[in-house]
């Protein structure tokens, strides 16, 4: 009898342990839209969303209001790593800010940070917005043999990033989230390159924003549109 009780206890502990760990883990490679104070890695990454925000910039004041936290919480997932950096571009060319040349964003670009996403089950890449806003060079479609110079243009940097990620993160679900309201050249480039690498592209629509960034309502819309896309697969 005692052996039977012990065996049952071992089985229950094992089942509960598996259940507790069964939720998929999620990593985010993003820009300001996916930041929140205290929830990005490395901690030195610049953030847009704070727990005491400027009301002129946003009405988001809790991490629970961000699109990714809502998505993770609603689906029983776990956060692996959020490597988002406000103002970051996919390529290495950043904002001119009154200067004649593009700023060198190699220290914060997606194509640099793509190596640091942990070991997740799902990765969301949410970028391209700052490349569009900064007017970064669009470049040509190029699917191999990238040079350092190539990575200062959007198309080759985007291709390099996806090529690297499907090899660095095998058997991981990778999705690209495309913001609404961007130039058609960026939209077409993202869809074409995602198609080449067979990366699903979630195209957002009608996102509510304050100062160009998702509001609380917009964050919920993003979460819902991501969920709708995934449920249809």
Region roles according to the model:
Residues 11-14, 20, 27, 84, ...:
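Generic detector of intrinsically disordered, low-complexity, polar/charged segments
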Residues 1-63, 72-74, 116-118, 170, ...:
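N-terminal secretory targeting modules
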Residues 22, 101-233:
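Alpha-helical cap/lid subdomain in secreted, periplasmic
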Residues 30-32, 84, 180:
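A mature extracytoplasmic/lumenal domain signature
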């Amino acid at each position: 009898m005692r052996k039977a009780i012990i065996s049952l206890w071992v089985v229950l502990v094992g089942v509960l342990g598996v259940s507790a760990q069964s939720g998929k883990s999620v990593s985010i490679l993003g820009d300001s839209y996916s930041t929140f104070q205290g929830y990005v890695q490395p901690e030195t990454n610049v953030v847009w969303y704070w727990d005491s925000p400027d009301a002129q910039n946003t009405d988001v004041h809790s991490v629970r209001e961000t699109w990714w936290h809502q998505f993770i919480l609603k689906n029983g997932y776990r956060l692996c790593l959020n490597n988002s950096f406000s103002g970051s571009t996919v390529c290495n060319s950043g904002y001119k800010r009154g200067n004649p040349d593009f700023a060198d964003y190699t220290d914060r670009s997606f194509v640099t940070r793509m190596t640091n996403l942990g070991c997740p089950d799902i990765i969301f890449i949410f970028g391209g917005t700052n490349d569009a806003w900064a007017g970064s060079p669009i470049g040509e479609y190029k699917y191999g043999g990238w040079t350092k110079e190539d990575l200062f243009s959007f198309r080759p940097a985007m291709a390099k990033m996806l090529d690297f990620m499907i090899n660095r993160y095998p058997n991981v679900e990778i999705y690209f989230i495309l913001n609404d309201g961007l130039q058609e050249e960026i939209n077409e480039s993202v869809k074409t390159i995602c198609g080449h690498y067979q990366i699903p592209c979630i195209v957002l629509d009608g996102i509510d924003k304050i100062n160009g960034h998702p509001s609380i309502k917009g964050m919920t819309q993003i979460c819902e549109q991501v969920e709708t896309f995934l449920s249809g697969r």
